[in-house]
């Protein structure tokens, strides 16, 4: 399998993405390091899909990870320091998730595995800065970026919330999720009946004291690989808007009192049958190989 991977898109929360560098070094695959903070899974997925769509690769690996203790040491305080965390703070997830993207044409020849879903669209996010400076309230810093990307996505794709079974953000958690709903309502967009946040799903918050919820690159990656994709494969959800969110801070900018810009990248993931029905209607004249240029298997 590693020989068939043309590119690896990988990133994490540590400086110079060293977790990714050491973690995938033995794969001996061409690697493109990426950093989008906690939005990195959305960044790797969207970039990987565009590479495959453009014909630059038949198979790419998209992977990210995060680790609680290392993130605390780099961005806040070492765990053994015993710093008290406010209720707005999020708990960095120790976890990793990876997916392989392949073109339809490549799948018809290799038959590596049964594909779970298809990526049918991406919306690359813009940096949005509302002047938030509290590193213990990253949900508030990321919510405006999530709002901006979701609104832009609806405009670009001429869609509305009801076109998706779920709209899933990365790690806004309790505070950021409420802010997102309010910000979208100001724009006359209501996603409250179908919104889900990975940071609120990853932990059992009634049993685990994680304050506002989960965060980190691994948060959305783990939920995507272990929960979202199986739900789509079972046709429980047929169309999902996956929007990982990231707070673009560093320990230097934080210590200097700079604000925390946010970013979010949206990826449309669809069940195979629901996509194929619409795809066939619009592309009857195209062959399967040509059709592979406009859709990506996961």
What are these regions (language model features)?
Residues 1-38, 163-178:
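Conserved beta-ketoacyl condensing-enzyme motif
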Residues 1-6, 149-163, 231-232:
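Phosphate/pyrophosphate-binding loops at sites that engage ATP/ADP/AMP, CoA/4′-phosphopantetheine
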Residues 9-11, 60-66, 101, 240-245:
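Short beta-strand segments
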Residues 19-21, 71-76, 132, 178-180, ...:
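Short acidic, glycine/serine/threonine-rich loops at helix termini
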Residues 35-62, 101, 215-236:
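Active-site-proximal alpha-helical scaffold in enzymes
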Residues 58-92:
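Flexible, glycine-rich active-site loops centered on histidine and acidic residues
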Residues 78-151, 156-159, 189, 193-210, ...:
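Condensing-enzyme catalytic core mediating Claisen C-C bond formation in acyl metabolism
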Residues 167-192, 196-228:
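Internal helical hairpin/lid segments
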